[in-house]
């Protein structure tokens, strides 16, 4: 039985005043496009979100787990869990399941104490960075990010770069959509979401 290929492109950028996450909205299965309207960025709290690349069921299970842990932390300590703490928690969860791994690659971004961006692999490898990309189109997206990123970018500049990175990946990676892009910005005021659509 042939394994059906799936794919996506998600990117994260640390800006001067927050975090920008972006992803295509296409869900593919093999050579078929299942939908053009899936959300691949999931809010965990009002200041932290994750992007999804990999098994949808695994990502949804992890998101529910992180939401519960964040609520428990808030209830116990009377303050929100920091982005770094949540990234380390997720890293421990993934590493603890390395013999039966979650088939995911996740970007976690948030602004609790400061803008923080992390990339996690299926075995819990954790890297904090200024920009990152995941999914089948990530080799194309990361090239755009490396070329266009600069320290102290504004949120708007980071949004423009993120859209350009996902669009470029969508033009070269058959499993990444390029017609509609989900963008989430996380600042100290909270999370905002928007969609950018293209006709070509």
UniProtKB/Swiss-Prot annotation:
Residues 1-7 form a propeptide. Pfam families: Proteasome (PF00227). The formation of the proteasomal ATPase PAN-20S proteasome complex, via the docking of the C-termini of PAN into the intersubunit pockets in the alpha-rings, triggers opening of the gate for substrate entry. Interconversion between the open-gate and close-gate conformations leads to a dynamic regulation of the 20S proteasome proteolysis activity. Its main location: cytoplasm. One of its GO terms (molecular function) is threonine-type endopeptidase activity. GO terms for cellular component: cytoplasm; proteasome core complex, beta-subunit complex. The keyword Ribosomal protein does not apply. Its EC number is 3.4.25.1. The active site is at residue 8. It catalyses: Cleavage of peptide bonds with very broad specificity. InterPro entries: Ntn_hydrolases_N, Pept_T1A_Psome_bsu_arc, Pept_T1A_subB, Proteasome_bsu_CS, Proteasome_sua/b, Proteasome_suB-type. Keywords: Autocatalytic cleavage, Cytoplasm, Hydrolase, Protease, Proteasome, Threonine protease, Zymogen. GO terms for biological process: proteasomal protein catabolic process. The keyword Translocase does not apply. It is found in: Cytoplasm. HAMAP family: Proteasome_B_A. Belongs to the peptidase T1B family. Component of the proteasome core, a large protease complex with broad specificity involved in protein degradation. The 20S proteasome core is composed of 14 alpha and 14 beta subunits that assemble into four stacked heptameric rings, resulting in a barrel-shaped structure. The two inner rings, each composed of seven catalytic beta subunits, are sandwiched by two outer rings, each composed of seven alpha subunits. The catalytic chamber with the active sites is on the inside of the barrel. Has a gated structure, the ends of the cylinder being occluded by the N-termini of the alpha-subunits. Is capped at one or both ends by the proteasome regulatory ATPase, PAN. This is Proteasome subunit beta 2.
């Amino acid at each position: 039985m042939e394994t059906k290929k799936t794919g996506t492109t998600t990117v994260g950028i640390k800006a001067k005043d927050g975090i920008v996450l972006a992803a295509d909205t296409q869900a593919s299965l093999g050579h078929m496009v299942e939908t053009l309207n899936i959300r691949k960025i999931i809010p965990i709290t009002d200041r932290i979100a994750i992007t999804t690349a990999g098994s949808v069921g695994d990502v949804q299970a992890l998101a529910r787990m992180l939401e519960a842990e964040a609520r428990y932390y808030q209830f116990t300590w009377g303050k929100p869990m920091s982005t770094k703490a949540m990234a380390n928690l997720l890293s421990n969860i993934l590493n603890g399941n390395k013999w039966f791994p979650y088939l995911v690659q996740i970007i976690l971004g948030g602004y609790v104490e400061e803008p923080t961006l992390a990339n996690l692999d299926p075995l819990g490898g954790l890297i904090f960075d200024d920009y990152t990309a995941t999914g089948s189109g990530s080799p194309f997206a990361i090239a755009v990010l490396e070329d266009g990123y600069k320290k102290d970018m504004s949120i708007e500049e980071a949004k423009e770069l993120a859209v350009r990175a996902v669009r470029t990946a969508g033009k070269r990676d058959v499993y990444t959509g390029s017609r509609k892009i989900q963008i989430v910005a996380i600042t100290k005021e909270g999370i905002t979401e928007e969609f950018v659509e293209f006709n070509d």
